[in-house]
From Swiss-Prot:
Reactions performed catalytically: glycyl-tRNA(Ala) + H2O = tRNA(Ala) + glycine + H(+); a D-aminoacyl-tRNA + H2O = a tRNA + a D-alpha-amino acid + H(+)
KW Hydrolase (keyword) present: yes
EC number: 3.1.1.96
EC supergroup of this enzyme: hydrolase
Keyword Metal-binding tagged: no
Entry's localization field: Cytoplasm
Protein's organism: Marinobacter nauticus (strain ATCC 700491 / DSM 11845 / VT8) (Marinobacter aquaeolei)
Protein name: D-aminoacyl-tRNA deacylase
NCBIfam families recorded: D-aminoacyl-tRNA deacylase
Amino acid sequence: MKGLIQRVSEASVAVDGETIARIGPGLLLLLGVERNDTLNEAKELCRKVLSYRVFPDEQGRMNVNVQAAGGSLLVVPQFTLAADTSSGTRPGFSLAAAPELANRLYGDFVAEASGLLGAGRVGTGEFGADMKVALINDGPVTFMLESGQRGSCTKM
């Protein structure tokens, strides 16, 4: 499971011209689910995202996590993060989870985040929808985080 986090001043996601979620200061997470991911990877990555220290402390160093900073989390499913880009000029998606598994694990991730951060501080995109994501990147600060099972996805 992969998550691209961006520290934001604000972020929102819209579907069919309607804003379905909006956050103020916090993290925008683009979440990619791979075919061998399980609930364990979802929980592990969630805890990693919420504890990752990307907000400034009193000395201006990145030393505070989103929870301690009082920030919010906007979770947007993005299957293209699971793409195989190792060869050629067209991405392959054989490493991406099937839609049913990806949707379930996306929901599990959101439930875990809501339980740990508080439901009022977690916004979501819409799985499978054509979404328009807007953000003001603060920094910019952007990191790719992955669950610990890296390397278990192999080509068939």
